[in-house]
From Swiss-Prot:
Residues 1-29, 84-194 are annotated as: Disordered. The modification ADP-ribosylserine is found at residue 104. It comes from the Eukaryota. Histones H1 are necessary for the condensation of nucleosome chains into higher-order structures. The histones H1.0 are found in cells that are in terminal stages of differentiation or that have low rates of cell division. It comes from Homo sapiens. Residues 105-194 have a biased composition (Basic residues). This is Histone H1.0. Residues 24-97 form the H15 domain. SMART domains: H15. The modification Deamidated asparagine is found at residue 4. Gene3D superfamilies: Winged helix-like DNA-binding domain superfamily/Winged helix DNA-binding domain. The gene is H1-0. Coiled coil: none annotated. One of its GO terms (biological process) is positive regulation of transcription regulatory region DNA binding.
Length: 194
């Protein structure tokens, strides 16, 4: 009996350890997923609400908060959870597996529709560009005409310069006036000779 008594106490602690792991609570990742599924919030569940749910439904130790933080980070990195708000372990989280297939199908449909719609738009854009191009060309020609007009105005400005040259010509008749007296003097000389 002494042998049985010594072997029995040795077996009991092992069972106690095994029972703590199995019966107290499941894995933190499973508890977090269960908490998010229970809330069913479209915006996602916050870390605090997940902690409250786990503490109220499972027997968790004192270090549960730190374990929940670590497991949330792991689930985000593995792709089980999606972080909708915040950074790191803070913010809101949703299950990625349940949302991804629906969203991916919706995104694929929208992408196909966008591609279909985009192709006619692309075809219509060159037409619009072609229609705009001829309209721009006639607009450009009046601008050229305006430039020609502007070029003509300096020519008009040059004409006054020629007008300024006319007074120089007017000075020539002044020179001609002294010539006339010379003619008179030559006539006087001719008279004297007679």
């Amino acid at each position: 009996m002494t042998e049985n008594s010594t072997s029995a106490p040795a077996a009991k602690p092992k069972r106690a350890k095994a029972s703590k792991k199995s019966t107290d609570h499941p894995k933190y990742s499973d508890m977090i997923v269960a908490a998010i599924q229970a809330e069913k919030n479209r915006a996602g569940s916050s870390r605090q609400s997940i902690q409250k749910y786990i503490k109220s439904h499972y027997k968790v130790g004192e270090n549960a908060d730190s374990q929940i933080k670590l497991s949330i980070k792991r689930l985000v990195t593995t792709g089980v959870l999606k972080q909708t708000k915040g950074v790191g372990a803070s913010g809101s989280f949703r299950l990625a597996k349940s949302d991804e297939p629906k969203k991916s199908v919706a995104f694929k449909k929208t992408k196909k529709e966008i591609k279909k719609v985009a192709t006619p738009k692309k075809a219509s854009k060159p037409k619009k560009a072609a229609s705009k191009a001829p309209t721009k060309k006639p607009k450009a020609t009046p601008v050229k005409k305006a430039k020609k007009k502007l070029a003509a105005t300096p020519k008009k400005a040059k004409k006054p310069k020629t007008v300024k040259a006319k007074p120089v010509k007017a000075s020539k008749p002044k020179k001609a006036k002294p010539v006339k007296p010379k003619a008179k003097s030559s006539a006087k000389r001719a008279g004297k000779k007679k």
